[in-house]
Amino acid sequence: VFGGLVIGQSLVAAARTVEGRPVHSLHCYFMLPGDPTIPIVYQVDRIRDGKSFTPRRVVAIQHGRAIFSMSCSFQVEEEGLDHQIAMPDVPAPEDLPSEAKLREAFINSAPEPVRRYWEQDRPVEIRPIDLRHYMSRDSLAPRQTVWIRATGRLPDDPAIHRCVLAYASDMTLLDTSLFYHGRSVFD
């Protein structure tokens, strides 16, 4: 089972127990591999319903065993300090090849694990700015810039948009950490 799926579904389960507060933090632990042939049961522990914060703990269970746990917190929206890093100077997503175009161009020459990955339909499309890490095993800087978007239409529900982002969070973090070591998630 793709870890991002479990993250996203866990956040959906937690968000359904909270009214009118966006998630502001989450922390996840993967404990066992999931079995894609059976359903996952999500148990939500309502830790506290405070004036400002609403923490939840979610455990994903299969075969009677915890495969994943998430601690997350929802917060009343309020004014506070705001900062962000400037957007890097990168091509716009429409100026980059789509995943379908990348598949056409590289799938026949790609290693088997890369082919299997690209052959799967996913609910989130990634358009990487730099493709070197897919084929190279050179040591690269441990950073990656990608554009992401849902492949289908999402409902007009900010909580669902946050859950899709949680899903996508598991799509590039591990590979980025391996770049410096000349490794890939496909190894």
Locate the predicted segments by residue.
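Terminal targeting signals and extreme-terminal segments of soluble enzymes
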Residues: V1-D187
